[in-house]
Structures are given as C-alpha cells and as structure tokens.
Amino acid sequence: MESSLYKKTSGKARRALRVRKALKGCSLKPRLSVVKTNKHVYVQLIDDVEGKTLAFISTLAKVAKTSGLTRKNQDNAKALGIKIAELGKGLQVDRVVFDRGAHKYHGVVAMVADGAREGGLQF
C-alpha cells in the first residue's frame, strides 16, 4: 500500500519531467525556471547545454530583501520576473524558454512570467 505522501511527491516529479522533457535551453535561449515553496519563490536562467545557471533571484536574495520582496505573493512574483529580465538583459539574453515545473500556469507562476515579459524577455 502506497502512502499518500509518496503518491503526491512522485506525481509532482512526474509532472515536472513531463514538462522538462520538451524544453531545452541554450546560452542564446536559456530556460527560465520557476520553483515555488510554501514561503518563497526561486527564479533562474539555466543553460542546459553547459549545465550552468546564468542568473538567479529569489525572495531570499539580498537584492530582493533590500527591495522588500521577502514574501511569496503575486506582487512580489511579478517584481522578481522584472528583476530576472534585467539580469538577463545584462547577459544579452532577450529570448527564453519558460519552465513552470510541476506547477500550474496561474497565480505566482503566471505573475513571474508576466513580469519577465514586462521586463523585456520574449518567450
């Protein structure tokens, strides 16, 4: 008999793999990955060819803390999207592949995407 926690975590991992198997990011068009927990949001630009993170921001980062973006909510998620777009522009990145992970495209995840678009990134 499977525990409900095992079913929940394995289902989440399956959903994330299903989304990521169709996505590949390179240095010209990196993957914009969004991970959310109960308290925080993490956003990163990833080059899958080299296996490197090009840029990273979260609600735990010093830049976010000085801006007052310390909570997981939709307003802060949009601001994080704008900040990651600024970091991407500094790396001459203007096109990305959006990776929502195992999460639905609504709420915090959608606001990160909207903020990144508003900041100048193209999906």
UniProtKB/Swiss-Prot annotation:
InterPro entries: Ribosomal_uL18_bac-type, Ribosomal_uL18_bac/euk. Gene3D superfamilies: 3.30.420.100. The keyword Ribosomal protein applies. This is one of the proteins that bind and probably mediate the attachment of the 5S RNA into the large ribosomal subunit, where it forms part of the central protuberance. Part of the 50S ribosomal subunit; part of the 5S rRNA/L5/L18/L25 subcomplex. Contacts the 5S and 23S rRNAs. Belongs to the universal ribosomal protein uL18 family. This is Large ribosomal subunit protein uL18.
